[in-house]
UniProtKB/Swiss-Prot annotation:
InterPro entries: Allergen/amylase_inhib_rice, Allergen/soft/tryp_amyl_inhib, Allergen/tryp_amyl_inhib_CS, Bifun_inhib/LTP/seed_sf, Bifunc_inhib/LTP/seed_store. This is Seed allergenic protein RA5. GO terms for molecular function: IgE binding; nutrient reservoir activity; serine-type endopeptidase inhibitor activity. The gene is RA5. Keywords: Allergen, Disulfide bond, Secreted, Seed storage protein, Signal, Storage protein. It is found in: Secreted. The keyword Secreted applies. Its main location: secreted. SUPFAM superfamilies: Bifunctional inhibitor/lipid-transfer protein/seed storage 2S albumin.
Length: 160
């Protein structure tokens, strides 16, 4: 009798554990894709600076139009990579880059969303700017925990 109670208790515990794990995983899956969400502290002024990654802004703009001397570009790249690595929480890096992109759009008077082929500034299309920004973690060889080969998750979500 006691062994039946033990077996029943173990089975009940196993079922409850599986149900809890399934409910937790369902929160992070959407249409058979894992959805990576940044930590709640990944906000301007908390997980990264209010004006994030100023040297990365310059680098992304340079990459988009393909201009600049090699020496100047190398210094900007080093500075950008240092700033990106300084974002302590690796979960916050893509969020900081996304916020940086929004800042670039505001500075240029462009809407935050638009067609990838639309020109954001002379010689630079929105899609090219966003690809350059999203690939900064891979370019700088800094960790982002989304398993996307160093490319920020929101680029894959945007469809280009």
């Amino acid at each position: 009798m006691a062994s039946n109670k033990v077996v029943f208790s173990v089975l009940l515990l196993a079922v409850v554990s599986v149900l809890a794990a399934t409910a937790t995983m369902a929160e992070y899956h959407h249409q058979d894709q894992v959805v990576y969400t940044p930590a709640p502290l990944c906000q301007p002024g908390m997980g990264y600076p209010m004006y994030p990654l100023p040297r990365c802004r310059a680098l992304v703009k340079r990459q988009c139009v393909g201009r600049g001397t090699a020496a100047a570009a190398e210094q900007v790249r080093r500075d950008c990579c240092r700033q990106l690595a300084a974002v302590d929480d690796s979960w916050c890096r893509c969020e900081a880059i996304s916020h940086m992109l929004g800042g670039i759009y505001r500075e240029l008077g462009a809407p935050d969303v638009g067609h990838p082929m639309s020109e954001v500034f002379r010689g630079c299309r929105r899609g090219d700017l966003e690809r350059a920004a999203a690939s900064l973690p891979a370019f700088c060889n800094v960790d982002i925990p989304n398993g996307g080969g160093g490319v920020c998750y929101w680029l894959a979500r945007s469809g280009y």
